[in-house]
From Swiss-Prot:
Main location: cytoplasm
Organism for this UniProt entry: Proteus mirabilis
Cysteine disulfide links: none
GO BP terms in the entry: bacterial-type flagellum organization; positive regulation of DNA-templated transcription; regulation of bacterial-type flagellum assembly
Molecular-function GO terms, alphabetical: DNA binding; zinc ion binding
Protein name: Flagellar transcriptional regulator FlhC
Length: 193
């Protein structure tokens, strides 16, 4: 009979608390810690004040392909890849650090969830590792973006270089100072010779 390590359990509890605080779903907690489902539910209720949401995890690569989600997913995954290459982090630690970097660069709008939730970011890493998604380089800006695996990359153009028309409409409605500055610059384009 294997004896439970108190140190291992303490690390799992600390990790579970950090993941819950960042918005992880129960399935992610079960996968990344060795704590029982009952203990995780108890911990979740204690930290969040409500039971964890029920239901299956998202299992579609298509979510990552829509223009806005793709930009956010690509930002997260590039941060994750940098952390792996620099040797500073691996596994769930790299996911958490990359997600914190993502939130720092793309803070959610007040009273709204971030576009890329932690569980989706974790799922993205698993999709890339399993070969369902990949990074492709944009032929215009040379940025690396998430695409379907085995998609021809020779003519790939990202949604920043070639935004869909609905993206431009959304930007014009935005109160975000960065978007307003871009709108002003767009307006000045007509005066260029």
């Amino acid at each position: 009979m294997s004896e439970k390590s108190i140190v291992r359990e303490a690390k799992d509890i600390r990790l579970a608390m950090e993941l819950i605080t960042l918005g992880a779903r129960l399935q992610m907690l079960e996968s990344e810690t060795q704590l029982s489902r009952g203990r995780l539910i108890k911990l979740y209720k204690e930290l969040r004040g409500s039971p964890p949401p029920k239901g299956m995890l998202p299992f579609s690569t298509d979510w990552f392909m829509t223009w806005e989600q793709n930009i956010h997913s690509s930002m997260f995954y590039n941060a994750y890849r940098f952390l792996l290459k620099s040797g500073g982090s691996v596994g769930i630690e790299a996911v958490v650090k990359a997600y914190r970097l993502y939130l720092e660069q793309c803070p959610p709008v007040k009273d709204q969830e971030p576009i890329l939730a932690l569980t989706r970011a974790w799922t993205l890493v698993r999709f890339v590792e399993s070969g369902m998604l990949q990074l492709s380089v944009c032929t215009k800006c040379n940025g690396s973006f998430i695409t379907h695996a085995h998609q021809p990359a020779s003519n790939y153009v990202c949604s920043l270089c070639q935004p869909p028309s609905r993206a431009i409409k959304k930007r014009k409605l935005s109160a975000n100072p960065a978007d307003i500055n871009l709108q002003l610059l767009d307006g000045l384009e007509q005066f260029r010779m």
